[in-house]
Curated annotation (Swiss-Prot):
Domain of life according to the entry: Eukaryota
Known function: Component of the 40S small ribosomal subunit. Plays an important role in controlling cell growth and proliferation through the selective translation of particular classes of mRNA.
Protein name: Small ribosomal subunit protein eS6
Gene: rps6
Phosphoserine PTM sites in chain numbering: 235-236, 240, 244, 247
Low complexity bias: start-end ranges: 236-249
PTM annotation, UniProt: Ribosomal protein S6 is the major substrate of protein kinases in eukaryote ribosomes. The phosphorylation is stimulated by growth factors, tumor promoting agents, and mitogens. It is dephosphorylated at growth arrest.
Primary localization class, coarse: cytoplasm
Gene Ontology molecular-function annotations: structural constituent of ribosome
Species this chain originates from: Ictalurus punctatus (Channel catfish)
Record carries keyword Ribonucleoprotein: yes
UniProt keyword list: Cytoplasm, Phosphoprotein, Ribonucleoprotein, Ribosomal protein
Oligomeric form and interacting partners: Component of the small ribosomal subunit.
Transmembrane segments: none
PANTHER family the record matches: 40S RIBOSOMAL PROTEIN S6
Length: 249
């Protein structure tokens, strides 16, 4: 089995092949995201602690977190799931994935070093790979350089040098995201003001409608009362007429 070991602190990654089954037994029956001591791999790994981050079986199917089996299953996957990239909007597909439990049928096991041991591993912990790009978000630039809210972030952007043959060397900087500027604050104030105006307008319209509704209800009530009074007058008139006719007879 091959072990793909990475060390985030230096940005290095190394692929080693382990033929001895006894060295690998410490990883068997362990689940993804489990932290395991790497001492059985050899003397140089003494004190190292690694986390199982994934792997692939001999046919190339990836391990999927949350699938509690050491075999292969077919799952209906959609956008947002691991082990699947949709090609169309809303597309779902049934894909074969391997469970999150490690066994001997894996060809590659991915490990991340959580704690460094006593000795350096050549090509993994003794050298550093510089990051190609610096942080882009304002809060992350502040965190990197330990800046306060009063400091200007724009002066601390990590610029990337661009060199071309026969041309003057220049640098390129990313556009800072979530940067709070007077313009952003102005837009925010405008949004809040517009929201207040909309709320007030809705309130005024609701009050006006309630007033109109009360007026219409009052008019309808008066109309109904007039009709009832008219009906009563007519019925009393008819009653008096019938009485007078009967008395004449």
């Amino acid at each position: 089995m091959k072990l793909n070991i990475s060390f985030p602190a230096t940005g290095c990654q190394k692929l080693i092949e382990v033929d001895d089954e006894r060295k690998l037994r410490t990883f068997y029956e362990k689940r993804m995201a489990t932290e395991v001591a790497a001492d059985p791999l050899g003397d140089e790994w003494k004190g190292y602690v690694v986390r199982i981050s994934g792997g692939n079986d001999k046919q190339g199917f990836p391990m999927k977190q949350g699938v509690l089996t050491n075999g292969r299953v077919r799952l209906l996957l959609s956008k947002g799931h691991s082990c699947y990239r949709p090609r169309r909007t809303g597309e779902r597909k049934r894909k074969s994935v391997r469970g999150c439990i490690v066994d001997a049928n894996l060809s590659v096991l991915n490990l991340v070093i959580i704690r460094k041991g006593e000795k350096d591993i050549p090509g993994l912990t003794d050298s550093t790979v510089p990051r190609r790009l610096g942080p882009k978000r304002a809060s992350r630039i502040r965190k990197l350089f330990n800046l306060s809210k009063e400091d200007d972030v724009r002066q601390y952007v990590v610029r990337r040098p661009l060199t071309k043959e026969g041309k003057k060397p220049r640098t390129k900087a990313p556009k800072i995201q979530r940067l709070v500027t007077p313009r952003v604050l102005q837009h925010k104030r405008r949004r809040i003001a517009l929201k207040r105006q909309r709320t007030q307008k809705n309130k005024d319209e609701a009050a006006e409608y309630a007033k109109l509704l009360a007026k219409r209800l009052k008019e309808a009530k008066e109309k109904r009362q007039e009709k009832i009074a008219k009906r009563r007058r007519l019925s009393s008139l008819r009653a008096s007429q019938s009485k007078s006719e009967s008395s004449q007879k």
